[in-house]
Amino acid sequence: MSIFERKYNFMSYLEWFETHANKHRVIVQKLSTQNYTKEMIIDYFLFENMVEKEPEFCLLYAKKQKCHNLQALNCYLCACPHFRFNDEGLSVEEGINYKSECSIHSKKSSYFVYEKVSHLDCSACSVPHTKAYIRKHFDVDWKKIMQKCFVTSPKA
């Protein structure tokens, strides 16, 4: 964890991933016990509904702030299945430790560097936040959809 992350009490990628998976599981289990269908579950995760009914799901909900500028932002996946991370780093280039990357190399992604640590910025990308994408990759178990995100063997 970088000094920046410690100073601002940020979670590591893996801590966030596990915490988010648990929050997601609780909501989906609740909806499943109410006999929600796949389509109803997807609709439930629309930004406006989540802000109202699940305000603890995302820190941005308190400000009614979207992480992506989309009219019909769907928060089912929150993170992207194409996001790859390792808290120790995926690679080091020119003294910069890259902790995350996009597996499809989206032209809408970019990086920001703080204290020689590079992080992927996906805020301009909409790939995982559309109903069509979510329908195609849907699973009630968020971790199954996201299983390739955590890279256990970083590149040399």
Task: Give the ranges of each region predicted by the language model.
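Cysteine-centered metal-binding/redox modules
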Residues: 2-156
